[in-house]
Amino acid sequence: MRLSRYFLPILKENPREAEIVSHRLMLRAGMIRQQGQGSFSWLPLGKRVLDKVCQIIREEQNRAGALEILMPTIQSADLWRESGRYNDYGKEMLRIKDRQDRDMLYGPTNEEMVTEIFRAYVKSYKDLPLNLYHIQWKFRDEVRPRFGVMRSREFLMKDAYSFDLDFEGARSAYNRMFVSYLRTFTRMGLQAIPMRADTGPIGGDLSHEFIILADTGESQVFCHRDYLSLAVPGANTDFANDGEIADIVKTWTTPYAATDEMHDEAAWEKVPESDKVSARGIEVGHIFHFGEKYSKPMGAKVTGPDGKDHFASGGSYGIGPSRLVAAIIEASHDENGIIWPDAVAPFDIGLINMKVGDADCDRVSEELNAAFTAAGKDVLYDDTDQRPGGKFATADLIGLPWQVIVGPRGVAAGEVEIKNRRTGERETLPIADAKKRFGVAA
């Protein structure tokens, strides 16, 4: 992609309304545009990151056996009345009427709708277990939306919902999602710690929030230092092996970890002082088992092997992709801008032509752009006539993992410079070696 043809509305000054780093950098880097209180448009650079975050989520949900669907944003109030939850969200839920004067709502969550789908089609234990997920925009009328997309009124959510015959099956489904979340956040370059948490208005009796430690976090969190070095399950994890998955969950839930709401001072006192970590944290995911909370009032029953009807035992598993983008920035930035982990970077390489119009610089830049692209790399080629200092500032601000710098002196010597955005290290390489560095075949 040529920067001269790309829509990247960079802001030179820090926006006054931005209270935290991620909000400031997302506005400055031209990732988002605020359209109203707690409402944002995602511009090309931001949308690329959001899409990559969603793709990782999809891959890990699919790996764990969940199946993707898509449910509508507008829901019938009747479903929520069935579950008895219509008034639980109060003014946070946007309520509307259609032209037939029927009560509708803009869904803040989807337990009722997915339960209606389940009860319509699933009648036997032979069709279980079942885990359905979707990625959809949600709306909650926050009293005080703030921190950009970190706490907005309209946001993107991945919601998964599991259905099983009994608690034993539901616990296995919960464990699979637990491990899936560990892998998901690690792939995005985040160190997420599962902490015992309250279930809130959704209800239930087993709940974990996945928290990343950050000074700008909204929650006070407490955990054992062991969490900072625990090994995350690999890509070869067998999600069909309930015993293996349960062992992983046990390892990740044995040390103490809790949000402020669930903090147990007596248990905390038993943790050695040298192992205590007390910090602010950002919630990036929430999973919980809610049993028959929705299946019972909504009549979602299946026939068991005993020939009797059983209310399905359910769980809900949420990740906010739009919030995750901000969380990644909070965890990975410096004074010059964003530092994207490779897996979610909008482009793999920022190719900088230091002297556009110089025949040799243009030739080498075009050659590298074509070679990197052919090798499967996403390249943002800065072919603008901006000054070199401005080009470097833009590249650092938007945080691409690698910068390949093409200048007159280097080209004359048959070389280019490569900069690692995370470490700041620079290396001068022959052009052929620079190609090999990024997977271009000789």
Curated annotation (Swiss-Prot):
The molecular function GO annotations come to: ATP binding; proline-tRNA ligase activity
Query: Which residue positions does the secretion signal occupy?
Result: none
Biological process terms from the Gene Ontology for this record are: prolyl-tRNA aminoacylation
List, alphabetically, the Gene3D superfamilies matched.
Anticodon-binding domain, Bira Bifunctional Protein, Domain 2
Q: Which keywords are on file for this protein?
A: Aminoacyl-tRNA synthetase, ATP-binding, Cytoplasm, Ligase, Nucleotide-binding, Protein biosynthesis
EC number(s)?
6.1.1.15
Q: Which HAMAP family match?
A: Pro_tRNA_synth_type2 (MF_01570)
Q: Quote the subunit structure annotation.
A: Homodimer.
Q: What does this protein do?
A: Catalyzes the attachment of proline to tRNA(Pro) in a two-step reaction: proline is first activated by ATP to form Pro-AMP and then transferred to the acceptor end of tRNA(Pro).
- Protein's name in the database: Proline--tRNA ligase
Record organism: Mesorhizobium japonicum (strain LMG 29417 / CECT 9101 / MAFF 303099)
